[in-house]
């Protein structure tokens, strides 16, 4: 007998934008389709609507761009992945993507990113910071326009 697929989504804040509502919808969709669904965010208005019987919600400061906080998030996400035996780590923004990327290396789990918007690639520092969104095992483009942007 196979076990349920366990998917962890990580997004900075769960507001009412397209990325956030998509994350919220996918979290509940996964449960409805025989998967275990986990969600890490730093809060937001949509968190009060999470069905806690369907989605395991964990609050962490994944909205932070502070490198020390991002490193702490890496450790905490790794512990969560090991504890719940998560199969896939799905990052939906750059700051948490760095923590998720490192956690995926530590835990040897699959890493997925979703590109929701365009990013400025002008400076070398920004280009490196943004590059995490393309370092995953699978990159999801939110639209054809975004797909063209990242090609």
Residue ranges and their predicted role:
Residues 1-151:
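Membrane-interface segments of envelope glycosyltransferases acting on lipid-linked substrates or membrane lipids
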């Amino acid at each position: 007998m196979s076990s349920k697929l366990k998917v962890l989504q990580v997004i900075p804040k769960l507001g009412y934008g397209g990325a956030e509502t998509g994350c919220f919808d996918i979290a509940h969709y996964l449960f409805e389709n025989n998967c275990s669904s986990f969600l890490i965010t730093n809060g937001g208005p949509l968190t009060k609507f999470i069905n806690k019987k369907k989605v395991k919600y964990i609050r962490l400061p994944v909205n932070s761009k502070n490198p020390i906080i991002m490193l702490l998030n890496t450790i905490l996400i790794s512990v969560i992945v090991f504890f719940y035996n998560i199969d896939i780590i799905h990052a939906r923004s750059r700051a948490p993507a760095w923590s998720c990327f490192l956690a995926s290396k530590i835990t040897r789990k699959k890493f997925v990113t979703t590109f929701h918007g365009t990013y400025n690639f002008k400076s070398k520092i920004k280009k490196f910071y943004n590059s995490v969104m393309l370092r995953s095992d699978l990159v999801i483009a939110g639209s054809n326009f975004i797909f063209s942007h990242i090609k």
